[in-house]
Amino acid sequence: MLYLSIDQHRKQLTINIRNEQGDVLVRRQVSTQWDKVREFFTDLRRQSQEIGGFMAILEVCGFNDWLITMLREFGCQEIVLVHPTKRATKKTDYRDASALGELLWVNRQRIRETKPVQNLKRVNLPSKTDAENRQLTAVRQRVTSLRTRTLNKIQKILLKHNLQQDCPTKGLQTKKARAWLRELSLDVIDRLELDQLLEQWELWNKQLQTLDEKITERLQEHEAAQVVISMPGVSAYSSLALGSRIGDIKRFPRPGSLANYWGLTPRCRNSGQSTDRLGSISKEGSAQARFILGQLVLHVLKFDEVIRSWYQRIKKRRGSRIARVAVMRRLATIIWHMVKHKETYIVGGTPRHRSQTAAAVGV
């Protein structure tokens, strides 16, 4: 088998190929023009067919999609996608490709057997459906942020002239308030800016409506999302965002594995005679999943008296901030149970978790 490592850039791929003995056979750059890159992979497939094919390793970046698709097209046996490593003192593309190639070759047996590799932060490749759902929910989050930014700019114009108190309704997101904004008397430039902001606001609303319709449609085809939506305060967007970021639940052997995957478990830096003290959460994994779980805490605390009692107990000892993160972590473990056993949400969490939580708070 051959072991291919790729340092990917926009205009070229830096290639390093090793054989089964670890010897470097090829060390070169390949243009990303379609004819050049296809010629290279055609030749690689021909050379590797008689010796068991080839494996590939590359670092994750924002434009891996086409290369991963091409690797699959040309029969790559295993694609290892990893997080970028710490920058070396002497950094070149050839050195980076060589380091990736050595990492792949040294750990080739464990990777073939799907065993964990120490210090190898591997990125799980989602299915096509999950990748599309992740992209869809990310677009929805981005459009929501743009709409919020537009509303903040409108508020700034009103504050500039101390006009916010004249609004006919408490908030701006009503038909009556929008009609008032369209007829508001302002200076020429402020009026021009406000008109453009109102047009943007209308555009974001139309785009959000289209996105929400698509999310609701795809939710019906996603098994995990249909389970997650039974939680308090979970919308179609939140359930699809969380469900698509779980993927195959079998890759998480324990409930805590999902919490760790979403960066909700504490770091630990003990050395020598130092006391065993945990630090803040790692914040690795999906920031969008953590944001959604943080929003769900408020709804769960209103709806679930068992979780609320447990939260209040932690809050008295450690403060509200740590207590909220603890609830987020508990929600991640509850989601694991729900998806794995196909259970809908019930007060206190899943049956096993409900009994543990009730015993802890004395309910």
PLM feature spans:
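A detector of single, family-specific signature residues
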Residues: 1-363
